[in-house]
Amino acid sequence: MNFTHINEQGYARMVDVSSKNDSERIAIAQAIVKMQPETMGKIRDGAIKKGDVLGVAQIAGIMGAKQTSALIPMCHPLNLTSVNLEFAFDEVNASIIIEAEVKTTGKTGVEMEAITAVSVAALTIYDMSKAVDRWMEITDIKLLEKSGGKSGHLVRD
């Protein structure tokens, strides 16, 4: 069996993508932070003592996407052209739904950057809110959609 990230000597290597064609790459990922309804209200009302939770999480998610190759050893450093995060309050489930869309034009996809963006944003929400809710849960981190490259356009059912 041949592994793409292991060389002939059995050591780790970054996959050579130099022969691939550049194409527009887009990935959309999601994470959910579950919490007490009171915590969600404090976040919405700007009543968390550490400050603007979603504003800081937005910046953290963007920074996370930009730093993905520094965090995940075999990820290629990419020239991202767009990172956008959106937050939605799910009142029924006392959750904040985070979605990130990441774009580039290049030889490899941006799935890991989108997943890292929502993960770091979720961790930031947790960090800034943990003083009022120690039992928050970060769940459902997943890729929702990707396009570009040989795989074409894929959407999670």
Swiss-Prot record:
GO molecular function: cyclic pyranopterin monophosphate synthase activity
Assigned EC number: 4.6.1.17
Catalytic machinery residues: 127
Pathway stated in the Swiss-Prot or TrEMBL entry: Cofactor biosynthesis; molybdopterin biosynthesis
Presence of keyword RNA-binding: no
GO BP annotations, alphabetical order: Mo-molybdopterin cofactor biosynthetic process
Entry-linked SUPFAM superfamilies: Molybdenum cofactor biosynthesis protein C, MoaC (SSF55040)
Pfam family, one: MoaC
Lineage: superkingdom: Bacteria
Gene3D superfamilies attached to this UniProt entry: Molybdopterin cofactor biosynthesis C (MoaC) domain
Subunit details: Homohexamer; trimer of dimers.
Family note: Belongs to the MoaC family.
Function field: Catalyzes the conversion of (8S)-3',8-cyclo-7,8-dihydroguanosine 5'-triphosphate to cyclic pyranopterin monophosphate (cPMP).
Protein name: Cyclic pyranopterin monophosphate synthase
Lineage: Bacteria, Bacillati, Bacillota, Clostridia, Eubacteriales
